[in-house]
Design a protein with these regions (language model features):
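TPR/TPR-like (Sel1-like) alpha-helical repeat modules
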Residues: 129, 215-219, 419, 530, ...
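Residue-level recognition of tetratricopeptide repeat
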Residues: 24, 58, 92, 126, ...
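Helix-start (N-cap) detector for alpha-helical repeat units in TPR-like alpha-solenoids
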Residues: 16, 50-51, 84-85, 118-119, ...
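Register position in tetratricopeptide repeats
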Residues: 28-29, 62-63, 96-97, 130-131, ...
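Canonical positions in the second alpha-helix
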Residues: 41-42, 75-76, 109-110, 143-146, ...
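Structural marker of alpha-solenoid helical repeat scaffolds
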Residues: 45, 79, 113-114, 147-149, ...
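Canonical tetratricopeptide repeat
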Residues: 55, 89, 123, 159, ...
Length: 596
């Protein structure tokens, strides 16, 4: 029995060799069914022959009998778990059948078991890239030499470009695409792909040259769009190119997408008015698409075509009402001066999307703009109940309090908004403005927050200014001069950063004057008055300094300027109106970003 057992493997291999050779010959000639018959017959006699079973799995795969192929390959792995050929073949099957996660797992095992066989590592890298696992794909490709075959080499460079692009390395991506293009320099697909890579790199000239080769030869609309993007990126004249694109023949099934993309490129580069005709054409071609009408309305609104914008928005609403379109209609009605209709639209937006802060903020801001502060406060308090940790809602609540004269309450709420915000700068900016405008002693918690932020962001001139100025106000009232050096340092840094802003110089003049350092106060006060000729306070302060230093004639001249500026001086309501404008712009921008 032992002798038979010892002879058996040798006999099996001898018997298997002719069967495997015949099956391989059949596969070589494309006869996968013939190979399947030969191998199946052989495995009836030798069911444990893993080589035959592996070949059978491959034959099934070539014949398109995927389930049978997977079954046979799994049987091979039961017998030989580290058979890298079977692992790779299974990985390829999973990839072809849309199961990239399973494919990746098999190819990872195959690469390890096959001692980093180049072909397997390359296939593994491809699957990793398709899974957007670019760092791992880059590692799989590391050290691999480009294939000798030209077609495979092009695919290799394109893969490396894709991985580099996925990692945000546009320079390397463009370089790899240029290598691929060099192997087939007249290929339209490679020209366009390389142009797209150069666009990502912002190499506008090279991108335009490559795409224009294809566009000139073929009038391919996609090539034309790449030329347009490159021209817009380089701030070139697009009028002639736009005319060519508008006259380009586009397949009917692709025209809507073409017009939409053309409009998107124009809008993204500030050519809003030019985008309107493209969006109109797209909306005509697809009249049932509410999104196209919405985009058209938004472009018309930005271009100041308010009647057209309202008409397009109403058509979009008739197709599909949404909070987004109601919010846009509210913006349009506000711009048209119909605040009652604007309020109704904003209320409709809130009703359609009660959990989205953007629409509640839009409604509250509309009410605030027309002095409906109590109503705005109710809207924001309702929003606060559902979203207590929304810093934007807290910012708006704080500003409502400020606009109604409750500066202390406003500051407290804005401090809370700053604590909630991922970046507190917006809330702290308004907090600083409120504190700077007060005649009372600055709030110590507010000053602490502003100064901490300025310490963490030393290049933020506005925060350095506010911190220095507020520290001075605190110390001046308390008769404390221990922070003078810090205050002066902050204000000088602010003056350097905010080169065109008179405020740091005005504040420095106040500090030096309070310390009787008149000769140092003078140049700062002169700069302050020269840079802000309408500031009554600046002229009055400079007049006092001139008098103190004995320049009576100059003092009298400054007093005359002070009297004229006093008559023109903005009152508290005007200052609040200016703050309102800044707030409305900021909060709408922030609310919009929260929805994106």
């Amino acid at each position: 029995m032992a002798a038979q057992d010892q002879a058996s493997p040798q006999t099996s291999r001898k018997e298997a060799a002719p069967a495997l050779a015949k099956a391989q010959a059949a596969l070589t000639h494309g006869d996968s069914q013939g190979a399947i018959r030969i191998l199946s017959d052989h495995l009836q006699i030798q069911p444990g022959d893993s080589s035959a079973r592996l070949m059978l799995g491959q034959a099934y795969a070539l014949a398109g009998q995927i389930d049978l192929a997977e079954s046979e390959l799994q049987n091979v792995l039961k017998m030989a778990p580290e058979n890298f050929v079977a692992l790779a073949a299974l990985g390829e099957i999973y990839e072809q059948t849309g199961q990239p996660e399973k494919a990746e797992a098999m190819l990872a095992r195959a690469a390890k078991a096959g001692h980093d066989q180049p072909e397997i590592r390359l296939e593994w890298a491809i699957v990793l890239a398709r899974l957007h696992r670019y760092k791992e794909s880059q590692s799989a490709l590391a050290g691999l030499a480009p294939p000798a075959d030209s077609g495979k080499r092009i695919a290799f460079y394109r893969l490396k470009a894709s991985v580099a692009s996925g990692l945000g390395n546009s320079v390397t991506a463009a370089s790899e695409m240029e290598k691929a293009l060099a192997l087939k320099p007249q290929d339209p697909a490679l020209l366009l792909a390389t142009a797209a890579a150069q666009l990502q790199r912002k190499n506008w000239q090279r991108a335009g040259e490559l795409a224009n080769v294809v566009f000139t030869q073929t009038r391919d609309p996609s090539a034309g769009l790449l030329v347009l993007e490159a021209t817009l990126g380089s701030h070139g004249d697009v009028h002639q190119l736009l005319e060519q694109l508008r006259n380009t023949a586009v397949p009917q099934a692709e025209e809507v997408a073409f017009r939409q993309r053309l409009a998107e490129l124009l809008i993204a580069n500030g050519h809003v008015s030019e985008s309107i005709d493209e969006l109109k054409r797209a909306a005509e071609l697809a009249p049932a698409r509410a999104d196209l009408l919405f985009d058209l309305s938004l472009a018309q609104f930005k271009a100041g075509q308010l009647d057209g914008a309202l008409n397009s928005a109403e058509k979009s609403k008739a197709l599909t009402d949404s909070a987004e379109v109601e919010d846009l209609i509210g913006d349009i009605q506000e711009e048209r001066g119909d605040n009652l209709m604007a309020v109704q639209s904003y209320q409709a937006a809130v009703k359609l999307a009660p959990e989205e802060e953007k629409y509640r903020i839009s409604l509250a801001v509309e009410l605030m703009q027309h002095q409906g502060f109590d109503a705005a406060k109710v809207v924001l308090q309702q929003a606060e109940e559902s979203q207590p940790r929304s810093w934007r809602i807290q910012l708006a609540l704080g500003m409502v309090e400020y606009f109604t004269g409750s500066d202390a309450t406003a500051s407290s709420i804005l401090i809370h908004a700053a604590d909630l915000a991922p970046d507190p700068e917006v809330a702290l900016t308004f907090l600083g403005d409120i504190q700077m405008s007060q005649t009372s002693v600055p709030d110590s918690a507010a000053v602490d927050h502003i100064c901490r932020y300025s310490d963490d962001h030393p290049q933020n001139g506005k925060m350095q200014l506010n911190c220095g100025a507020l520290l001075f106000e605190q110390d001046y009232v308390a008769g404390n001069r221990t922070h003078v050096d810090e205050i002066v340092k902050r204000l000088r840094e602010a003056a350097e950063i905010l080169a065109s802003d008179p405020a740091p110089h005005c504040e420095l003049a106040k500090v030096y004057r309070s310390m009787d350092r008149w000769h140092e106060a003078l140049p700062e006060a002169e700069r302050c008055a020269r840079m802000d000729v309408n500031s009554a306070e600046a002229h009055y302060r400079l007049a006092q300094i001139y008098r103190r230093l004995g320049s009576l004639e100059k003092s009298q001249q400054e007093m005359k300027l002070y009297e004229g500026a006093s008559r023109r001086q903005a009152d508290e309501n005007t200052r609040r109106d200016e703050t309102m404008k800044a707030f409305v712009y900021t909060i709408r921008r922030e609310a919009q970003s929260s929805k994106q």
